[in-house]
Amino acid sequence: MEGSDFLLAGVLFLFAAVAAVPLASRLGIGAVLGYLLAGIAIGPWGLGFISDVDEILHFSELGVVFLMFIIGLELNPSKLWQLRRSIFGVGAAQVLLSAALLAGLLMLTDFAWQAAVVGGIGLAMSSTAMALQLMREKGMNRSESGQLGFSVLLFQDLAVIPALALVPLLAGSADEHFDWMKVGMKVLAFVGMLIGGRYLLRPVFRFIAASGVREVFTAATLLLVLGSALFMDALGLSMALGTFIAGVLLAESEYRHELETAIDPFKGLLLGLFFISVGMSLNLGVLYTHLLWVVISVVVLVAVKILVLYLLARLYGVRSSERMQFAGVLSQGGEFAFVLFSTASSQRLFQGDQMALLLVTVTLSMMTTPLLMKLVDKWLSRQFNGPEEEDEKPWVNDDKPQVIVVGFGRFGQVIGRLLMANKMRITVLERDISAVNLMRKYGYKVYYGDATQVDLLRSAGAEAAESIVITCNEPEDTMKLVEICQQHFPHLHILARARGRVEAHELLQAGVTQFSRETFSSALELGRKTLVTLGMHPHQAQRAQLHFRRLDMRMLRELIPMHADTVQISRAREARRELEEIFQREMQQERRQLDGWDEFE
C-alpha cells in the first residue's frame, strides 16, 4: 500500500468509526457491532473504498496486542499462577472438545479429515479482542465467569504454537518443511526473552524515567509493545502472547500505572481498527452463493461452543447465573482462524471454496456475539428482576423505593448500608452478576442490568423514587445516566460519585451540585490528623480543614467555564495565598481560646 493510499485508508477508517459507532450506540447494538458494520460498508463488498484487506487486517492485530499488554499489567505472576487450574484445565478442555466436535461435523460436509482437523481447531478458538471488550462492557472482569473466560482465552493463545506446527504434519510435508532444529531455536529464543525481560525491563525503564521527559517514556512503552510483538511474530508465535508476557513481567513494577496510561489511547483506536478490518473481510459473494450452508454453519458453531463452555462452567462450579454469560461471550470464532486457515491454504489442505466458507462463518459468528449477549442480558434481567421468591425476605418490601443506588462496589456499599441502617427504602442496580448473587443472599433488593437503560430504571421504581445515587466506576456511564435522569425523570434528586476534579467539573456543568469526590474527604481528614501530629491544636486543625473544603468548592465552581484552561494555574496560586491569609488571621484570633480543647476523636 502506497503512502498516500495508506493515509486515505486511515481517514476512511476514522470517518467510518466516527459515523457508525455513535449511531450503533444510539440504536443500542453496541460499539463492537458498529465497527463491524462500518467495515462491511467501506470494504470491497460494500462501497469498495478499500480493497487490500489482508494487509490492514494484519496491521490491525496491534489492537489486540495493546489490549493484551494492558491485561498483563493487571496480572502479576502470583495471580497468574493461581489461575493455572482454569488455564490448563478448563482452557485445554474447551479447545480439545470444541475442536473434536467441530472437526467431526466438518468431515460430514465433504472436508478431508486433515482439513477438518485444522478447521475444527481454528473454529474452536474465540476472539480475544471481542471477548475481552464485551467482558469489560458487561462488568465481568472481576466476576468468576470473567476470570474463567480470561483463562480460556489465555490457553487459546498458548495453543497457537502447536496448532501452527501441526499444519505441515497434516499436509504430509513434515519431512521436507518442518525443521525441528528451528523449533528448538525458537523455544530457546522465547526462554531468552523471558529471562531478559525479567532482569532488564525495570532497570531500563528506571533509566528512561530518570530523564523526566514524558514523551520518551511513551516512546519506550510503544517500543516495548511493538518490539515484543515483532519478536514473537518472527518466531511464528502469537504477537498477543508476547506482549501479554511483557505486561506480566512489569505488573509489579513501580511504572505499571504510567505504562497503562501511555498505552490506553492507542489500544482503543487500534481495537476499533481491528473490528472494522474484520467487517471488511466478510466475503459477501460467498455468503450470497452459499447462504444456507453459511447460516447453518454459524448456528452450529455458536451452539456447539456454547454447549461445551456451559458444561465446562458447570463442572468447574460456576454459578448458574454466570454460566450463560461465560458461554455467550466466548461463542464466536476468533482472529487466529484467519492466520491458521491461511497457513493451511498455503499447504493446499483446503479445496475449492472451503477456506472462504470457513472465514465467512468466523466473521459472521463474531457479529452474532454482541446480539447474543444482549439476549443473555435480557434473560438474566427476567431471572433477577422478576418477583421476589416467597422464601426471600428482602430489606425492602415496598415496590416504591425512596432512593435508587446505581453501582454497589466499595463506594456504593457504604452509602447503601448507611441508608438501610436509617430505615430508608432503597433499590440497587448492579451489572456484575457475582455482586447481584451476593447481595441477594443478604436480603438486598437488587436489579441486574445496565442502569443506562430507561426501561430498567422504570422497573426499579425511578418514577416514584425521590433520589438517585450514581456510583458508577466509569465517568462516561455516570454522565450518560445523569443525562437520562434529567430527560426522563426530572423529579429525581441526582447525587453522584466523582472520581476526580475533571469529573466534578463535568457534573457541575451538567447541573449536578450534589456530588462527592471519592478521595477528597478522606484525604482532608487524614490531612487534619497530620496537622495535629505536627503540633496544631485539634480545633484549629478542624477549622483549617473546613476552610480548605469551602475554598476548594468555590474554586471548582468559579473555574467551570475554563476547567481545561491555563487560567486555573494562576487562580490556584491566588487561592493558596488567600487560604494562607485566612489561616494566619484565625490563628491569631483563636490562640487564646484553644487551651480548653482536647482531641475530639
Curated annotation (Swiss-Prot):
- Biological process (GO) annotations? potassium ion transport; proton transmembrane transport; regulation of intracellular pH
Write out the GO MF terms: glutathione-regulated potassium exporter activity
Main location per UniProt? membrane
Q: Which GO terms describe its cellular component?
A: plasma membrane; potassium:proton antiporter complex
Q: What residue ranges are annotated as transmembrane?
A: 4-24, 29-49, 55-75, 87-107, 115-135, 152-172, 177-197, 207-227, 230-250, 268-288, 291-311, 324-344, 356-376
Where is this gene product found? Cell inner membrane
Which UniProt keyword terms apply here? Answer: Antiport, Cell inner membrane, Cell membrane, Ion transport, Membrane, Potassium, Potassium transport, Transmembrane, Transmembrane helix, Transport
Q: Look up and give the membrane topology term.
A: Multi-pass membrane protein
Q: How is its activity regulated?
A: Activated by adducts between glutathione and electrophiles.
Q: Mention any Pfam family matching this sequence.
A: Na_H_Exchanger
Would you indicate the residue range of the signal peptide? Answer: none
Q: Ranges for the RCK N-terminal domain?
A: 400-519
Q: How does it assemble?
A: Interacts with the regulatory subunit KefG.
Biological function = Pore-forming subunit of a potassium efflux system that confers protection against electrophiles. Catalyzes K(+)/H(+) antiport.
According to its UniProt record, which protein family does this protein belong to? Belongs to the monovalent cation:proton antiporter 2 (CPA2) transporter (TC 2.A.37) family. KefB subfamily.
Quote the protein name from its UniProt record. Answer: Glutathione-regulated potassium-efflux system protein KefB
